[in-house]
Amino acid sequence: MTDDKTIRVFVAKPKQQTPKQHPTHTLSILNLIRWKNLLMIALVQLLIKYALFEPFLKTTELTITLNAFGFGLLVLSSICIAAAGNIINDIYDVETDLVNRPSKVVVGKSISEKTAYILFITFNVVGVLIGFYLSNLVGRSGFFAIFVIISALLYVYASYLKQTLLLGNIAISILVAMSILIVGVFELIPVITSQNQTTQFTFFKLLLDYAIFAFLINMVREIIKDIEDVDGDYKSGMNT
């Protein structure tokens, strides 16, 4: 009598692969915050300090407030708040961008809307907190309101003003001009004395001229963008 033998075959299970993260996730974040625009803001502010103010410190009565560390904080705060503004702008612009520039849409594709909101809040909090510290550092705690107002206005612009004829263009152009004026506010105003006030105001007026020029250039740019984006804006119900 033959014994029945059971032959067992063991089949190795294929290893489960860990889902790969999107290789361009970091690049997507950089595109979301529009790093080239942020770099331009930082460059302009650095030029104001080191090419406009610093050369005249020894030859005029010009006095500035911030050392390299303090000025670095001002630049960092500016680009953080601007980055937050760019993020919230992209979040609200998804529908129109899918029509006007579908290849450049980041939110909802390479970055989720939830992640975008987290980044928006993070950049805003960091930028405003640095502004709070910096305002107290120069002994002008009231300057903190500037950062809060800019942050709030960027949100209102993205969620409401951008959909309104010309009003949105004016608002964002004012914010662009403020990225220039804020250097004068923190560098010149806190150290005004009766001896140097003429010089301080002369340089502040010079900055004001630059800011007005930036306002006008950005207004033209925004109007041209509205003309280019008319199809997407119309389909989204925007009165631009």
Stretch-by-stretch model annotation:
Residues 1-240:
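Multi-pass alpha-helical membrane architecture of UbiA-family
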